[in-house]
């Protein structure tokens, strides 16, 4: 795999630096696009083969605003970019990164003076940004999305609408089947075809036809690579998709700060486009989550997204907040041997991100694993008799068990509430927004009060989510109650449900141990079971293993 960029340290930078924690590595990635310059700084954990973002910066540099006659980058655009990149370099060095990797995309690819400008940046700023092809851009976008989304066994169509080009990828958890790039983007369309606004209907129809003609080769290529009967999931990344998600989220009664994983239907997009088209740029800039620069290019971006969905025959897309710049981080990790197999990396994304958050907040890993093991065993033993949930909910229970005590990182008092906040506002890659909310709520209600209508954590849940939390949070209470000491003391347990009575028998590791602490903790859960679901809880010791009981029966 070829190197995307190398970095040169500038010894003249004297900003105060922050060093990474022992065993951690830091790397910065720069995405020099047609519309914006992006910087991310990542903390890489070699042990877990994962990374978390320490900082994300964006500057609207509009490098794609080229001279109409010569096609060259304008002096104004180059100066905006110089200032932004100098800021990026100083931020990266102040965070103690060991390397800055960076790429330049369509604006630099096409401008006659693009390479000369890159040479100047290397000389003056010590940044070696590499111009990449549209196909390489698509590959890096794929890696970025792959790092933050669970592909499971389904193919995914990834659409990234940039300023100068639009990348369309067909991929699954095994390979990128098709990597395409079309020379149609929000800034390019605005520059070439939008002279006055609001657009007349005739101009809108022209733009749709132009976009369709530009995208059709890419769409044909990806659709040919789909096997008969396959139903792909569509993922949309970058500015236009995030703007759509922000606008729809602002209208929602249950808005969330994080847009990653939000699902948007074609009907919602079509209705939004019709509301946006009559607005002026000034009116668009007044919309929630839309700044002045995004407002200028919002309409072309929306038309690209709408046309792509129609051509692909998709009725919904999922928003990803990871794209090219995160792909640069993954690519750096691959090249440095920190990810041996990117497909194994993908298959474990959920488990890895939970472990990453647990380590971040100082969770006792041994105890968390024991609680998670107890919780899953309780889930399996109570299926059908107490609940009818499947493997998806089982995995959410595991994640909540692993992270239930992360709130201790803030304070021991009311730590379950702190756990809810940290989980709900954290970065759980591979989990959807709704799944993350369920995990947080399970952790919130593993102790103390049962859910109440006035609780914010309860108001955010829909009916199905509440059913999951009501039942599985009770199982998590039992799992936590069975692990109150630094070391394991329970060998195994058996749970039997008769009528509305739950009988729980514990087998101690040490036959002489009466497990008084654990039994006391379990008995304290009885009121929650009685008030929460109408079950009576009875706990006792046994000296016979479950396998021996079955043989005797």
Language-model features: locations:
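A generic, well-ordered mixed alpha/beta core segment in the N-terminal half of proteins
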Residues: 155-169
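A short amphipathic beta-strand at an alpha->beta junction
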Residues: 532-550
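Helical "lid/coupling" subdomains associated with nucleotide-phosphate turnover
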Residues: 5-8, 27, 41, 66-97, ...
């Amino acid at each position: 795999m070829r190197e995307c960029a190398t970095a040169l340290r500038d010894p003249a930078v004297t900003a105060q630096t922050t060093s990474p924690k022992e065993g951690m590595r830091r790397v910065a990635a720069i995405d020099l696009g047609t519309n914006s310059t992006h910087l991310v700084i990542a903390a890489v954990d070699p042990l877990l083969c994962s990374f978390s973002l320490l900082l994300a910066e964006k500057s609207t540099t509009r490098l794609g605003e080229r001279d109409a006659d010569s096609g060259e980058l304008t002096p104004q655009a180059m100066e905006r970019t110089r200032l932004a990149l100098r800021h990026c370099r100083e931020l990266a060095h102040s965070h103690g990164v060991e390397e800055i990797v960076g790429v330049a995309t369509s604006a630099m690819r096409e401008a006659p003076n693009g390479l000369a400008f890159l040479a100047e940046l290397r000389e003056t700023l010590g940044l070696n940004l590499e111009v990449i092809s549209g196909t390489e851009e698509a590959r890096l976008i794929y890696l970025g999305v792959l790092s933050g989304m669970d592909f499971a066994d389904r193919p995914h169509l990834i659409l990234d609408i940039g300023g100068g080009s639009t990348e369309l990828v067909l991929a699954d958890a095994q390979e990128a089947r098709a990597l395409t790039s079309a020379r149609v983007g929000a800034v390019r369309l605005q520059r070439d075809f939008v002279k006055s606004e609001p657009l007349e209907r005739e101009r809108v129809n022209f733009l749709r036809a132009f976009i369709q003609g530009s995208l059709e080769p890419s769409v044909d290529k990806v659709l040919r690579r789909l096997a008969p009967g396959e139903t792909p999931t569509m993922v949309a990344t970058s500015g236009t998709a995030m703007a759509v998600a922000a606008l729809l989220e602002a209208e929602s009664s249950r808005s969330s700060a994080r847009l990653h994983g939000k699902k948007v239907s074609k009907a919602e997009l079509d209705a939004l486009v019709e509301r946006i088209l009559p607005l002026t740029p000034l009116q668009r800039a007044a919309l929630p989550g839309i700044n002045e620069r995004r407002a200028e290019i919002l309409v072309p971006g929306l038309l690209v997204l709408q046309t792509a969905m129609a051509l692909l025959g998709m009725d919904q897309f999922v928003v990803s907040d990871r794209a090219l710049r995160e792909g640069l981080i993954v690519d750096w990790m691959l090249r440095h041997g920190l990810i041996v197999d990117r497909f194994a990396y993908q298959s474990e994304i959920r488990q890895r991100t939970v472990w990453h958050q647990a380590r971040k907040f100082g969770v006792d890993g041994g105890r968390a694993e024991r609680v998670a093991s107890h919780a899953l065993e309780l889930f399996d033993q109570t299926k059908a008799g107490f609940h009818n949930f499947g493997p998806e909910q089982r995995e959410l229970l595991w994640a909540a068990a692993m992270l239930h005590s992360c709130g201790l990182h803030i304070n021991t008092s009311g730590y379950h509430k702190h756990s809810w906040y940290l989980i709900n506002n954290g970065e759980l890659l591979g989990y959807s927004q709704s799944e993350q909310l369920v995990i947080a709520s399970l952790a919130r209600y593993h102790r103390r009060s049962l859910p109440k209508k006035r609780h914010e954590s309860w108001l955010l849940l829909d009916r199905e989510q509440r059913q999951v939390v009501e039942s599985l949070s009770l199982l998590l209470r039992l799992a936590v109650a069975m692990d109150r000491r630094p070391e394991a003391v329970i060998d195994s347990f058996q749970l039997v449900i008769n009528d509305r009575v739950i009988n729980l028998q514990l087998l101690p590791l040490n036959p002489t141990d009466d497990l008084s602490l654990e039994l006391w903790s379990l008995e304290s859960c009885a009121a929650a079971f009685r008030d929460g679901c109408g079950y009576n809880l009875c706990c006792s010791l046994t000296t016979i293993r479950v396998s021996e009981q079955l043989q005797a029966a």
